[in-house]
């Protein structure tokens, strides 16, 4: 028996998530992973690397709870929000029996995580405006334990209608969790659903330090939920999910000075986003620029594959969305520095279409 044959059937069939780094490239303008364009620095204050870290570092939990407006017992910290996705599926879904549901086009890790654990995936396509198709969701809820809703949605950039999410929460009460992925909520904080946690005990909110906090390399995310949900997740999380340096930096990033710095970064990105949107609308190969509430822009291009390859060859790395349902011809562009935006604009203007 070969090593391949020893592996689980579903793992042999699995197509891994194609992260920005996995796709590679030799660029000097990286606009494919929705990272903050410049680095932030911190001084490490904890020098106890000979000891194992806390499972849930107190300073990180308390600082995030204060920032998010929830109780500390409603917060779980993990290795990025991606680990939160995995924990929810592991804790609530029986392999071979239960299902998760999501609405494409959306973030790809919901399906990859479910498939890894042998849990059925149900994809209910979004409406033409990328909002929830509530009747279709209702028709597909049997056996579903977790519904993932990305808002603002990656890669389309729009907020999911809050009233539709409320309808979904009523529809799933006593049947399934509704997980609102708010990875990009710092760019539109008025749209957060954290204020609904008391009203809906089956609501879960995912957050991250990877985007507006400019700490994608830290791998630190949060799950906000009813205490009963957090207690169950604590049963399946690894004993030491955060290293001591990660917890040290996260606590600093979530202190008042760190929060203020994050909000200044958001204001900077919003200015740069508008600059890039205005320029894209006047470029010949750009057919449509979609509204965005995030730090990235989705646009539809004439000959998008050729445009993508041309910019790639010039060291400008964007994210190709052609394989996502309803996103034919679309590329996603992270909002970077003014210099990076200008590189994109100049390269696109030079395209012959």
UniProtKB/Swiss-Prot annotation:
GO terms for biological process: L-histidine biosynthetic process. The modification N6-(pyridoxal phosphate)lysine is found at residue 211. Pathway: Amino-acid biosynthesis; L-histidine biosynthesis; L-histidine from 5-phospho-alpha-D-ribose 1-diphosphate: step 7/9. Keywords: Amino-acid biosynthesis, Aminotransferase, Histidine biosynthesis, Pyridoxal phosphate, Transferase. One of its GO terms (molecular function) is pyridoxal phosphate binding. Its EC number is 2.6.1.9. The keyword Transferase applies. CDD domains: AAT_like. Pfam families: Aminotran_1_2. It catalyses: L-histidinol phosphate + 2-oxoglutarate = 3-(imidazol-4-yl)-2-oxopropyl phosphate + L-glutamate. PROSITE patterns: AA_TRANSFER_CLASS_2. Its cofactor is pyridoxal 5'-phosphate. Belongs to the class-II pyridoxal-phosphate-dependent aminotransferase family. Histidinol-phosphate aminotransferase subfamily. Homodimer. This is Histidinol-phosphate aminotransferase. It comes from Enterobacter sp. (strain 638).
């Amino acid at each position: 028996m070969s090593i391949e044959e020893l592996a689980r059937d579903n793992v042999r069939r699995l197509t891994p998530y194609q992260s920005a780094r996995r796709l590679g490239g030799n660029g000097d303008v990286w606009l494919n992973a929705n990272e903050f364009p410049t680095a932030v620095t911190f001084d490490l204050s904890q020098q106890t690397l000979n000891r194992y870290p806390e499972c849930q570092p107190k300073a990180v939990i308390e600082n995030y709870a204060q920032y998010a407006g929830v109780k500390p017992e409603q917060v779980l910290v993990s290795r990025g929000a991606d680990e939160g996705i995995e924990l929810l599926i592991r804790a609530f879904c029986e392999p071979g029996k239960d299902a998760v549901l999501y609405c494409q086009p959306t973030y790809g890790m919901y399906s990859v995580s479910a498939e890894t654990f042998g849990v059925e995936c149900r994809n209910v396509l979004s409406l033409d405006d990328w909002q929830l198709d509530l009747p279709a969701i209702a028709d597909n809820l049997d056996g579903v334990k977790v519904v993932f809703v990305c808002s603002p949605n990656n890669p389309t950039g729009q907020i999911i209608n809050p009233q539709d999410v409320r309808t979904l929460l009523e529809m799933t009460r006593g049947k399934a969790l509704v997980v609102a992925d708010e990875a990009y909520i710092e760019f539109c904080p008025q749209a957060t659903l954290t204020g609904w946690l008391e009203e809906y005990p089956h609501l879960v909110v995912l957050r991250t330090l990877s985007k507006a906090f400019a700490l994608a390399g830290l791998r630190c995310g949060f799950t906000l939920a009813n205490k009963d949900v957090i207690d169950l997740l604590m049963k399946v999380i690894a004993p030491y999910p955060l290293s001591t340096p990660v917890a040290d930096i996260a606590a600093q990033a979530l202190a008042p000075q760190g929060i203020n710095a994050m909000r200044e970064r958001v204001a900077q990105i919003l200015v740069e986003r508008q600059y890039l949107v205005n320029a894209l609308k006047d470029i010949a190969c750009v057919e449509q620029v979609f509204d965005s509430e995030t730090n990235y822009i989705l646009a539809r291009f004439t000959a998008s594959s050729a445009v993508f390859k041309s910019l790639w060859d010039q060291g400008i790395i964007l994210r190709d969305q052609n394989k996502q349902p309803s996103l034919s011809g679309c590329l996603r562009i992270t909002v970077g520095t003014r210099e990076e935006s200008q590189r994109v604009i100049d390269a696109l203007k030079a395209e012959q279409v």
